[in-house]
From Swiss-Prot:
SUPFAM superfamilies listed in its UniProt record: RmlC-like cupins
Organismal lineage: Eukaryota, Viridiplantae, Streptophyta, Embryophyta, Tracheophyta
The protein, known as: Glutelin type-B 4
PROSITE patterns per the UniProt record, alphabetical: 11S_SEED_STORAGE
The Cupin type-1 domain, residue ranges: 50-245, 316-465
Length: 500
């Protein structure tokens, strides 16, 4: 009997431990920087010559332009990334769509409203309004509209776009909205082929596309309703055949960015209510733990949709100086955005770093430990060198605004701002990206014994001690100590132009 009781007790504790581990996986935060749920990475890739990219082709719509970087280039394919830049003119609406891959949007300039439609979440915005008809016609009855939350965006915002979540953007300002999109094709959320696919819910892409420096081609793409039979569609949605045809976008030549003639009439709370909502959202975010692995784990006590999921913040500003992680008043500031600050990034599995370098400031040489990096120059110019595992320079040039450089994982990079300074944003293919610095506080030299450094480089102990400590407590952005008139290692323009 004692043996049976002991066996039952052992089984009980084993089950308890297993349940505890499963619950931790389900509801614990996915903040392990060494784990990244990405596919691919096994193909042979050559990163022996990097190049600065600019948009290769553009598609014009009624109220804006979509510019595509060269997704067929080996560097984009090897890193599993897809990049576009969109310009939305005032009163322009980017029609609703969703994508097979998760992504991030960086608002380079402009402001407006956007909506992300999460499945299963309630419509928390409600309004009633009276529609007035022209004189001589009777007034229609009151209509009630309700929808999910509308977000306001502005310059410097990062917007997370989970795979399969419908979204739209609207420019309600007086200046064009310019936004950079980065998508992760190798994310496990994408179970299709490693290509970017946008599923339009409205509009179409039946517009001419222009290849920069090449001939004009025709780009064809319809919205998802166009493939259904008109009668079946009208029956399924409970609308007449004419409305069904409108849904299918027949004879609609406006493209994917359309102009709203009289502007969108959007419901939004008063300023005080917005502040209250923001506070509630921050409280919910502090308590929220993203359940990224839940889809792959069986559960009988929940349906995969946490209450806080519907209120999770999908937008965060990365240019706010008060959010800087490191700041040197003579060199610049660095702001990092990862899943610990922005929990929805656990669903997207991307992160971002915004760097503002002052005049002639230099960034501590570093490598990305657990991610590829896509660097986009926002303002100013930067001298950049990238070195491979063979000690060879694979990029050596000056990046200008609008250019993008892919830096492979573990490749060492050195950046120096020119006289007007430099601002750039880098996207990392890990929700909690890590870097390892070569100089300054928390660098690898500071972590090594003096004798190791002296013997490794055949220098004296005094020289090794100076190498180890000469940047003192500086971290990230450095003020240059040794001014030179020329930089023979750099070229005025990128030496790594696109190979056409």
């Amino acid at each position: 009997m004692a043996t049976i009781a002991f066996s039952r007790l052992s089984i009980y504790f084993c089950v308890l431990l297993l349940c505890h581990g499963s619950m931790a996986q389900l509801f614990g935060p996915n903040v392990n920087p060494w784990h990244n749920p990405r596919q691919g990475g096994f193909r042979e890739c050559r990163f022996d010559r990097l190049q600065a990219f600019e948009p290769l082709r553009r598609v014009r719509s009624e109220a804006g332009v979509t510019e595509y970087f060269d997704e067929k280039n080996e560097q984009f394919q090897c890193t599993g990334t897809f990049v576009i830049r969109r310009v939305i003119e005032p009163q322009g609406l980017l029609v609703p769509r969703y994508s097979n891959t998760p992504g991030m949007v960086y608002i380079i300039q402009g402001r407006g409203s956007m909506g992300l439609t999460f499945p299963g979440c309630p419509a928390t915005y409600q309004q009633q309004f009276q529609q007035f008809l022209p004189e001589g016609q009777s007034q229609s009855q009151k209509f009630r509209d309700e929808h999910q939350k509308i977000h306001q965006f502005r310059q410097g915002d990062i917007v997370a776009l989970p795979a399969g979540v419908a979204h739209w953007f609207y420019n309600e300002g007086d200046a064009p909205v310019v936004a950079l999109y980065v998508f992760d094709l190798n994310n496990n959320a994408n179970q299709l082929e490693p290509r970017q696919k946008e599923f339009l819910l409205a509009g179409n892409n039946n517009r001419e596309q222009q290849m920069y420096g090449r001939s004009i081609e025709q780009h064809s793409g319809q919205n998802i309703f166009s493939g259904f039979n008109n009668e079946l569609l009208s029956e399924a949605l409970g609308v007449n055949a004419l409305v069904a045809k409108r849904l299918q976008g027949q004879n609609d030549q406006r493209g994917e960015i359309i102009r709203v003639k009289n502007g969108l009439k959007l419901l939004r709370p008063a300023f005080a209510q917005q502040q209250e909502q923001a506070q509630q959202q921050e409280q919910a975010q502090a308590q929220y733990q993203v359940q990224y692995s839940e889809e792959q784990q069986p559960s009988t006590r929940c349906n995969g949709l946490d209450e806080n999921f519907c209120t999770i913040k999908a937008r965060l500003n990365i240019e706010n100086p008060s959010h800087a992680d490191t700041y040197n008043p003579r060199a610049g500031r660095i702001t990092r955005l990862n899943s610990q600050k922005f929990p929805i990034l656990n669903l997207v599995q991307l992160s971002a770093t915004r760097v503002n370098l002052y005049q002639n400031a230099i960034l501590s040489p570093f490598w990305n430990v657990n991610a590829h990096s896509l660097v986009y120059i926002v303002q100013g110019h930067a001298r950049v060198q990238v070195v491979s595992n063979l000690g060879k320079t694979v990029f050596n040039g000056v990046l200008r605004p609008g250019q993008l450089l892919i830096i492979p994982q573990h490749y060492v990079v050195l950046k120096k701002a020119e006289h007007e300074g430099c601002q750039y944003i880098s996207f990392k293919t890990n929700a909690n990206s890590m870097v390892s610095h070569l100089a300054g506080k928390n660098s690898i030299f500071r972590a090594m014994p003096v004798d190791v450094i002296a013997n490794a480089y055949r220098i004296s102990r005094e020289q090794a001690r100076s190498l180890k400590n000469n940047r003192g407590e500086e971290l990230g952005a450095f003020t240059p100590r040794y001014q030179q008139q020329t930089y023979p290692g750099f070229s005025n323009e990128s030496e790594n132009e696109a190979l056409e």
